[in-house]
Amino acid sequence: VAYFHQRGIRYITLTHGKDNLIGDASYDTTATYGGLSEFGEKVVAEMNRVGIMVDLSHVSDNTFRDALAISKVPVIASHSSVRKFTPGFERNMSDELIQALAKNGGVMLINFGGTFIDSAYAAGSAQVREHVVNWLAENNLSRRDPSAQKYIQDYTALHNPFPTVARVADHFDHVVQLVGIDHVGLGSDFDGVGDSLPTGLKDVSMFPNLFAELLKRGYSKEDLEKIGYKNIFRVWRAVAEYAEKQP
């Protein structure tokens, strides 16, 4: 951990898609440790000591709780959304976890992926995938075939349109109403969610569309500054200052 800090790393996501030596992941139903492993507990403590932010996106609920119980400083969830809008999707955060993270002083950064922000879109995506697999087999085509790509694009647009910027704003609203403006920020996951990003929020150049929607909902300039950078910088600063005081 100290080596990575020396190399410039300032946050580490504890797990990804599968349970690892550190702890259990949200996408993995194995529950190898029932949360953090003993090694994972040491990793979190060492991250605190050297000044690396603990990122709890991708971890299971129990791993999330275990890490919060150990961490002496605020944590982050670098690209997670609100589970209320996607019931049963453990990769997103429940209200209980959002409240626990806020009590810790942390910040969750909202993921913009369609399946993360809208359960209807997620269900539609599964149906589209099944149809496309069958259609490709029936027509003896590969996804790389230009005609197949055109068909998939047109079929998806017709049967499962992308979510909107307004739906992303709903996630910000929920967090703010639940725990306040100091605990939410921009996670995006632009490079991780494939072709599922909302209409009007396909890349960073479109952030003004989201900010305009939030302004319409009554957010202030100071609120947007907190969402844009102040909240995550506050956590980063707290982690660094704690580490500076360690032997």
Identify the meaning behind each predicted range.
Residues 110-115, 179-201:
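Short acidic/histidine-rich active-site segments
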Residues 202-247:
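Mid-to-C-terminal alpha-helical segments outside catalytic/metal-binding sites
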Residues 21-34, 197:
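Glycine-rich phosphate-binding "P-loop"
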Residues 8, 54-56, 79, 108, ...:
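Conserved, mostly hydrophobic/aromatic
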Residues 18-23, 59-65, 82-85, 115-118, ...:
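Active-site environment of divalent metal-dependent phosphoester hydrolases
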Residues 1-6, 28-76, 89-106, 167-182:
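Histidine/acidic residue-rich metal-binding segments in metalloenzymes
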Residues 94-150:
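Aromatic-lined glycan-binding groove of carbohydrate-active enzymes
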Residues 148-166, 170-173, 221-236:
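C-terminal helical cap
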